[in-house]
Amino acid sequence: MKVLLIAGGWSSERDVSLAGARGIEKALCALGHDVTWFDPATSLDGLLEAASSHDFAFINLHGSPGEDGLVQAMLDTAGCPYQGSGPAGSFLALNKAVSKQLLRRHGILTPDWAFLAARPAADWEPGLGYPLFVKPNTGGSSLCLSRVTQPEGLAPALEAVFAHCGEAIVEPAIPGVEVTCGVLGDTALPPILIRPAEGAFFDYTSKYTPGGATELCPAPLPAEVTAHVQDVTLRAHRLLGLRGYSRADYILRDDGALFLLEVNTLPGMTPTSLVPQEAAAIGLDFPALIARLIELGMTAAGR
């Protein structure tokens, strides 16, 4: 097939997108596909025309215009199939303040939060206690994520977010271990337990620096806990109207309470990223995972 590989974009996660796309291109070529790159930052105006002349689009964008559903809407207009969720599910999952309301309404635990659409007054306090996390409301890769332990650290953390993003979300730090779990088709994958370097948390540096974190797959958790993580992951995937694949990130507290932090509709796709690790645990190497995502995308488009 003629595959349009969409990567780059204009978000702060551009470099992550391009790095992952190189591995995807290699896998697509190994599968026998003819690959053409398209970078929305260069010419978003040309996407409809490019998509119309290709059999499939593989999206590897992080942040806007991929995770917010814009590219998916344009591909739908062009009649070009693609992997993953459609415009509505993509937008809903990317917006943490909105998706958290939906998840909580349906009984899924998520940390309390304060949402900010603009810089607050200098003396503003979220009333969530310390430590807490400050992060963009619509963003990934843990960019601009700050852990704040004292009130005097709140204003600089918020400024770091608003320097790059229009909205912020503040959450209390939940003590526990970090767990992530992917969905492929209608199946929850084996969860991963993440152990950041001592004294750190799973921020951008930990994610993309060798040795920044230890990722244990499958997670060394009791069978009933693993089953619970997978069940909640599938529920969240369906509640948000997602399809194809996704990845949910959690904090698992010592008492067994599982707090869903966010759901990613275009999770990292380097061969060593989290979802590819989970797929490998069930016998799917990276090219096989890419092939499965294409198959799911074609099926969703009725092809």
Swiss-Prot record:
HAMAP family tied to this protein: Dala_Dala_lig (MF_00047)
Subcellular location: Cytoplasm
Protein encoded by which gene: ddl
Domain (ATP-grasp) ranges: 100-295
InterPro entries referenced in this protein's UniProt entry, alphabetically: ATP-grasp (IPR011761), ATP_grasp_subdomain_1 (IPR013815), D-Ala_lig_Van_CS (IPR000291), D_ala_D_ala (IPR005905), Dala_Dala_lig_C (IPR011095), PreATP-grasp_dom_sf (IPR016185)
Name of the molecule in the record: D-alanine--D-alanine ligase
Superkingdom in the source lineage: Bacteria
Pathway: Cell wall biogenesis; peptidoglycan biosynthesis
A cellular component annotation (GO) from this entry: cytoplasm
NCBIfam families found in the cross-reference section: D_ala_D_alaTIGR, PRK01372.1
Native source organism of the sequence: Nitratidesulfovibrio vulgaris (strain ATCC 29579 / DSM 644 / CCUG 34227 / NCIMB 8303 / VKM B-1760 / Hildenborough) (Desulfovibrio vulgaris)
